[in-house]
């Protein structure tokens, strides 16, 4: 099993997208990229901790590659906006790839460059590619948020 960590706006929708991907074993939403140890949603929502709302993914590389997960990421959000996605604004909603090893870093850089050259977007890609730091899981009520909503209907 391998691990991938991405940020692409509000983590609820990102988790909903990745949880449907064949080869994804598990997803967990949380916070990464900041300075505060064990941040809460309230802490991160101030925009002052440096954390991004993110998703931590465990995947089976014999079923789906890291590169294929990057394609899902690019198609899940607008990577040309800085510190916002849709109605959500602030550095906690930034687009980022948090790599866990050199192979992931190289794959992310290649993938971002290919997307830039594709001409799909008129603006430059703003997605950060940074070394993964500690991932702090979000509160339970954030986990599988959209899945929980479906069961309440």
Curated annotation (Swiss-Prot):
SUPFAM superfamilies: Peptide methionine sulfoxide reductase (SSF55068). The keyword Oxidoreductase applies. It catalyses: L-methionyl-[protein] + [thioredoxin]-disulfide + H2O = L-methionyl-(S)-S-oxide-[protein] + [thioredoxin]-dithiol; [thioredoxin]-disulfide + L-methionine + H2O = L-methionine (S)-S-oxide + [thioredoxin]-dithiol. The keyword Oxidoreductase applies. It comes from Methanococcoides burtonii (strain DSM 6242 / NBRC 107633 / OCM 468 / ACE-M). HAMAP family: MsrA. Its EC number is 1.8.4.11. Has an important function as a repair enzyme for proteins that have been inactivated by oxidation. Catalyzes the reversible oxidation-reduction of methionine sulfoxide in proteins to methionine. One of its GO terms (molecular function) is L-methionine:thioredoxin-disulfide S-oxidoreductase activity. PANTHER family: PEPTIDE METHIONINE SULFOXIDE REDUCTASE (PTHR43774), PEPTIDE METHIONINE SULFOXIDE REDUCTASE MSRA 2 (PTHR43774:SF1). One of its GO terms (biological process) is protein modification process. Keywords: Oxidoreductase. The active site is at residue 10. Pfam families: PMSR. This is Peptide methionine sulfoxide reductase MsrA. Belongs to the MsrA Met sulfoxide reductase family.
């Amino acid at each position: 099993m391998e691990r991938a960590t991405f940020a692409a706006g509000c983590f609820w929708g990102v988790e909903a997208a990745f949880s449907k991907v064949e080869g994804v074993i598990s997803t967990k939403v949380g916070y990464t990229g900041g300075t505060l140890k064990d941040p809460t949603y309230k802490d991160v929502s101030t925009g002052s901790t440096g954390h991004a709302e993110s998703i931590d993914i465990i995947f089976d590389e014999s079923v789906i590659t890291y590169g294929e997960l990057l394609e899902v990421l690019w198609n899940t959000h607008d990577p040309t906006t800085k510190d916002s996605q849709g109605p959500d604004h602030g550095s906690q909603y930034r687009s980022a790839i948090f790599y866990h090893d050199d192979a992931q870093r190289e794959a992310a850089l290649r993938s971002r460059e290919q997307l830039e050259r594709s001409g799909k977007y008129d603006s430059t890609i703003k997605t950060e590619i940074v070394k993964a730091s500690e991932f702090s899981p979000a509160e339970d009520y954030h986990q599988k948020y959209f899945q929980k909503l479906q069961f309440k209907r």
